[in-house]
């Protein structure tokens, strides 16, 4: 079963690298050019009155983990990093209160889902 999942994840990584959307990932003044897949993610958050409400990220980026390299070191996303699309739109790595800004998508840590909010 692991072999099948590995092949599927590897195929998805290869597809993103070949057909994905070009972005620039920024940490301070250090850029990383990479291809990503984009979507949106819904979160359930406490509404402060004993209930919950649904909050959507402005954009969720699916990134091959091996492509997040700064100064020769593999890194993981950090809150307040910036992702800039090829059209100039900018997104800050953020998630609703109590949620993680990113997580690995697969059991082999080959893909990362990054949650963001639009900043311009």
PLM regions and their residue ranges:
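Active-site-proximal polar cores
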Residues: 1-34
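Short, conserved turn/kink motifs that form compact alpha/beta structural patches or helix kinks used as
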Residues: 21-120
